[in-house]
Amino acid sequence: MVRPSSPVASRRIVCFSHKTALEILTALPPSQKPQPMRSRKFPDQAPSLKDAQLASDRILEQCPALSLSRPLHVTSASTSHNHRTDVVEFHRSGKPFGGTGLLSLGEGTRVTSVPFTFVQMATSLSLIELLELGYELCGTYRRGKAGEPTRYHADPL
């Protein structure tokens, strides 16, 4: 059991979303795919900037080939952090959702599921970009990253 005074107990749950969730979900190898959660809402409290950075560091340790762009996108049900910094952009979503919207990466770290992330991205992408993302998520093809060629018939996320 974790004592309340320990650093682990004081950390808030970090839920990566939007572009950060896509980067994580596409980079993790099949052996490290996150586990579905039964939770139907985002964490009640927004994490601190430090908690978000620590969670990001843990993910990068698990997957050294991953590169997370900045700002990190983090969602919670709270409005305690509703601003954007160079490091983290906080999003708020207080309404419960159906299905499996969150996946566990362990150690108090969550990521939005592929379908949920697609819906989140719909607000910031053009129609063409959204169609490309939909094809990529469904396994039709995977866009190349940093000089890699586009792969067709890729596995769906």
Residue ranges and their predicted role:
Residues M1-L157:
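Short gly/ser-rich loop at a beta-strand->alpha-helix junction or flexible surface loop bordering the NTP-binding
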